[in-house]
Every structure is written in structure tokens, then in C-alpha cells.
């Protein structure tokens, strides 16, 4: 009886840890179908509900009283319907929404209302410039949005269970609750190894490398390095760790903020052939 109770508790904790609601904003890039299939496969692995959102702006034709709102809404819904017809949704519950407004505002609202655990982002939602890693829209989501963690999925990437995550940060101080939940969920589901790389930069402060018990319970190995930026630390240690997912932290002046002020991020500045998990601000 005691063993059955223990199994019940373990299974209950496992279910609590798993991500339940995922959000995918879609654009018009040629990678959208591939990205959406990845999102469905990811959701299936977690038994999660998938929200697919296409956001459109409202315009009034100059010199007329014609409001294009209803036309754009209809076209957006038709676009979503066409997209979903090209996807194998498997057993995943998929909710599609055509919503008007500014991208960041809409996604923040949806995240709150639907209790989103993770946003899956393609590098270029609308951009066709091959020199760009993160396009204007995707970069804006990563840099400006206050909300859940994001997963940047490389173009054409096929879903597979995560085995090894390299987590890089220059400060391990955590003051907010639940920011590590996506990592805990990945670890609970895939039993993946998580290596923590603490990067000492010229802006290092006393206590930055104090790893609390919560973070210690998530990671399997901790190492330190000294580099000018967190990004350079990742480059230096990437091959020795050979991860199949990177994990960084979104901060006001963090990994994606300091080096590039514009929303667009060029491939010459940063690119990744594996998914990048961007956690919410820790402080």
C-alpha cells in the first residue's frame, strides 16, 4: 500500500512539472509549416494544449472611410485554416486564433489568459533575409515581451527528445518564482542532462556564482569560465559540452540585449543550429 502511494505521489509531481499550455505565433515565412509541426510534436510529447496565433494589424485605407479590420480578420483565419491543413496534429488539442493588435501586447495578453508555459518561436517570422538569425518580429518577442520562457527553434528543425542542455549565465541569483519551471519540465520528461556554465565577465559581482538549492537540484554539473560576455563563454565551451539545446536568461541587459540594440539579430553576431531556451528574468 505504501509503495502504491509513493508511486501515486511521484506520478502526480511528474504531471505537475510538465508544461500544459504552449503558444506558437505564426507569420508568413517559408519555415512556418515546419515550425508548426515541431510545435505539435513538442506538445504531443508533453500532452500539452497548443495555441496557434496569427496577429494582424488594423489599417484604414488613406482617403477613405473603409476599415479593413473585417477583411484582415477573415484573411488571417483563412491563412490559419490553410496552415493547419498541412500539419499532422496527431492527438494534440490545437486552438487557432486570429487576433489584432501589436505583437508583444497580444502575446502578453494571451499568455496571461491561457496560462502559457512556453512560447515556441521561429527565428524569422516574416523576414526573407538569409543574413538574419532573429527577424524583427521574433527579436521583438525575445527582447521586449514580459512573459513566459521562449524556445527559439532553428528553421527546418525536427523535434526529438532533448538529451543534453547547456545553460549559460553570468549571475545565478534567482529572486522570482517558477522561472526554472521549463527546465524542470524538460528534465522530468526527457531525463536530460543539464550542465550549468557560470561565466565571469568584467561586470561580475560578489555572490553572482552563489547557486541556490533550487538550481542545484536541476543541474547535473557546474563549471565556470572567464570571458568578456556570456555569449563568448558559450562559444568557448560549446564543443566540449556538445549540447542539443542551449539555455540562456532574458534580462534587461542580458544575453540578447547588450550586444544588439536593434530587434533584428544577424547571423554574423549570433546563430544556433540547435534550439535555444530563453528563460524569463530571474530577478
What do these predicted regions represent?
Residues 59-60, 104, 128, 159-160, ...:
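Generic structural signal for helix capping and beta-alpha/helix-loop junctions
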Residues 65-72:
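Short glycine-enriched, charge-decorated loop/helix-capping segments at active-site entrances
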Residues 108-158, 240-241, 245-283:
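Gly/Ser-rich helix-loop-strand patches that form or flank binding pockets
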Residues 17-65, 164-224, 243-245, 271, ...:
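Small/aliphatic-rich secondary-structure junction motif
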